[in-house]
Curated annotation (Swiss-Prot):
Functional note: Carbon-carbon bond-cleaving enzyme which participates in a carminate degradation pathway. Cleaves the C-C bond in 3'-dehydrocarminate to form kermesate. Also shows weak activity with other C-glycosides, such as 3''-dehydropuerarin (3''-oxo-puerarin), 3''-dehydroisoorientin (3''-oxo-homoorientin) and 3'-dehydromangiferin (3'-oxo-mangiferin).
Protein name in the entry: 3'-dehydrocarminate deglycosidase beta subunit
Family classification: Belongs to the C-glycoside deglycosidase beta subunit family.
EC number(s) stated in the UniProt entry for this protein: 4.1.99.28
Activity under varying temperature: Optimum temperature is around 40 degrees Celsius.
Length: 132
C-alpha cells in the first residue's frame, strides 16, 4: 500500500558488530507483530539470512521468528521499527538496501483467509557510523 515508505531514507547505520536501518509499517492501521509473514533484506545485491535478522519495535527486540509470535506487541503506524543485521559490517559510502515486508491483515478476509500483502522498497543510502 505504501511501498515507497517502507525503508526510512538515510537511516542506515553500521559499526563493527553489524548494520541496521529503520522501516515503517506499509499499512494505514496498527498491526500486531504476529501479522508479519516475511521480512527479507538484501544489501548490495546479497540477501541477508532472515533467521539472523532482528526487529526492534517499541521497547523490545526479537529475532524475526520470535516477533511473529508476539500477538500483544503492536506496531503503530507512526512508529519506525529498526531492522538489525548482526555481523553485516559495511564500509563507508553508499549501499543499496532492499526490504520486502509481507503482512497478514487479520480483519480483511479474502476467500476465507486474511488478506496477505507484500511490499518491496529499495533505497540507496550512505552508511552512518552507529553512535551509542
Amino acid at each position: 500500500m505504501f511501498r515507497e515508505r517502507i525503508i526510512v531514507q538515510d537511516s542506515l547505520v553500521a559499526d563493527e558488530s553489524g548494520s541496521a536501518f529503520r522501516i515503517r509499517l506499509p499499512w494505514y492501521r496498527a498491526l500486531p507483530l504476529s501479522t508479519i509473514e516475511e521480512l527479507s533484506v538484501t544489501v548490495d545485491g546479497t540477501a541477508f539470512d532472515p533467521a539472523r535478522l532482528r526487529i526492534a519495535v517499541n521497547d523490545g527486540e526479537w529475532a524475526l521468528a520470535e516477533a511473529q509470535l508476539r500477538t500483544d506487541d503492536v506496531w503503530f503506524v507512526l512508529d519506525d521499527a529498526t531492522v538489525r543485521l548482526p555481523g553485516l559490517v559495511l564500509d563507508a559510502g553508499a549501499h543499496e538496501v532492499q526490504a520486502t515486508l509481507s503482512m497478514r491483515i487479520p480483519y480483511l478476509p479474502v476467500a476465507g483467509k486474511p488478506l496477505s500483502m507484500a511490499e518491496t522498497d529499495q533505497k540507496r543510502m550512505d552508511v552512518k557510523e552507529l553512535t551509542a
